[in-house]
């Protein structure tokens, strides 16, 4: 019962109007079909009276045919008018829906604009840019430090390899010379023996410099 007293919305009114226009269009089409049948019947009657030589009957039937055809022509005009009204109703409905959508969008945009402070938004973007730059600088410093550590480690390894190589060469040379030297008592060798069999500090330093080790 509540639905009977419910106030119709604009959409409901438009739907009812479209329904009514469609009903009128169907009625016009039925009337035109009936007029076309009558038109054919009159044409047949006129031909029949003409064959019978009844001129008066032919004139009367011819007048009826003219009136009927005029009436049929009017049905086309009315049908065109109904179609135009239906089209206008559809356009009006589309415009109303568009207006409703625009109204909803405008309200949403208005609510968003109220919550968004341009000054705060600008400040937030500036803070983000500042912090992003800090992060990039920190990352760059960390990368540079790691590169220095790895480079220093590689240099140290290369230097150690060179020193080991020199010591190995010196050790081999010393072993060779020590093998040829006469064995002494368990005491220290004499100065002349050390000079003839050992390698001096100058010799070691010269070989280190030759290998690029300061």
Curated annotation (Swiss-Prot):
UniProt KW keywords: Coiled coil, Cytoplasm, Endosome, Membrane, Protein transport, Transport
UniProt keyword Manganese present: no
GO terms, biological process: endosome transport via multivesicular body sorting pathway; late endosome to vacuole transport; protein transport
The organism's place on the tree of life at top rank: Eukaryota
One GO term describing the cellular component: ESCRT III complex
Motif MIT-interacting motif per UniProt: ranges: 202-212
Compartments where found: Cytoplasm, Cytosol; Late endosome membrane
Region (Disordered): 178-214
Pfam families: Snf7
Coiled coil feature spans: 25-55
Protein's membrane topology: Peripheral membrane protein
Major localization class: cytoplasm
ATP-binding is among the record's keywords: no
PANTHER family: CHARGED MULTIVESICULAR BODY PROTEIN
Complex formation: Probable core component of the endosomal sorting required for transport complex III (ESCRT-III). ESCRT-III components are thought to multimerize to form a flat lattice on the perimeter membrane of the endosome.
Family the entry assigns: Belongs to the SNF7 family.
Protein name as catalogued: Charged multivesicular body protein 2b-A
Originating organism: Xenopus laevis
Taxonomic path: Eukaryota, Metazoa, Chordata, Craniata, Vertebrata
């Amino acid at each position: 019962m509540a639905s009977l007293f419910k106030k119709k919305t604009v959409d409901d009114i438009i739907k009812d109007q479209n329904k009514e226009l469609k009903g009128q269009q169907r009625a016009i089409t039925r009337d035109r079909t009936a007029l076309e049948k009558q038109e054919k019947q009159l044409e047949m009657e006129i031909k029949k009276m003409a064959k019978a030589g009844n001129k008066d009957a032919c004139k009367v039937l011819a007048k009826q045919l003219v009136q009927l055809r005029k009436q049929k022509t009017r049905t086309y005009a009315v049908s065109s008018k109904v179609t135009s009204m239906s089209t206008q109703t559809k356009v009006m409905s589309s415009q109303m829906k568009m207006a409703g959508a625009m109204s909803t969008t405008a309200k949403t945009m208005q609510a968003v604009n109220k919550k968004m402070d341009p000054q705060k938004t600008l400040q937030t973007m500036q803070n983000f840019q500042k912090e992003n730059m800090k992060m990039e600088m920190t990352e760059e410093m960390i990368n540079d430090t790691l590169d220095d550590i790895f480079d220093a480690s590689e240099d140290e390894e290369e230097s150690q390899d060179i020193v080991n190589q020199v010591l190995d060469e010196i050790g081999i040379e010393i072993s060779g010379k020590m093998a040829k030297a006469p064995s002494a008592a368990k005491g220290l060798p004499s100065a002349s023996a050390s000079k003839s069999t050992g390698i001096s500090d100058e010799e070691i330093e010269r070989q280190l410099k030759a290998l690029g080790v300061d």
